[in-house]
Amino acid sequence: MPQTTALIVIDAQESFRHRPYWSEADLPGYVARQQALVDGCAHRGMPVVQIFHVEAQGPFSLASGNVRTLEGLSIEPDATFHKQYHSALAGTGLMAWLVSRGIQRLIVSGIRTEQCCETTARHASDSGFQVDYVSEATLSFPMRHARSGRMYTTAEIRERTELVLEGRFARIATVAEAIEGAAVSD
């Protein structure tokens, strides 16, 4: 039976280390869970797709040398795409790649929880894909609300993302649930 689920690893790249908000606080747990997800999906024959965010200048430029897999992760992707927008499905060729392979379900993971990962999950859902959003295999950083000045923790950001995606755009899944769900659905 052909594989109909693909893992999407979004922006797990060295570029982020050069942003002022970079923090190592949640990094070890993220790397462990992301690697477990990559390994589990690859072991089950799911295509693993790696997405890199690319900009013309700065740490996200190809010339910077930072558009490469985040240290600590080992990913052997079946396909790699460069994006310039928040959604991995916008302007990358990823949509055509998925459709041509009969992919119906996406497992979304990577960096940042509330930005490119959430945007990709919404876009994928609206495009007809089933989506498993593995929030424990996403990474973000504390953020300050511009108007109120309140600082939001990564746990609060993750919870908010789960709240707005669950049941509308995605199934919120753990690493194990996402891998097992693929085994059941395929």
Language model features by range: what are they?
Residues M1-P2, Y21:
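Generic signature of intrinsically disordered, low-complexity, basic-rich segments
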Residues H53:
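Conserved H-loop
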Residues L7-A12:
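N-terminal nucleotide-binding beta1-loop-alpha1 segment
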Residues R17-P28, S148-M151:
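Acidic/histidine-rich helix-loop elements
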Residues P2-A6, A32-R44, A56-D186:
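Active-site-adjacent betaalpha module
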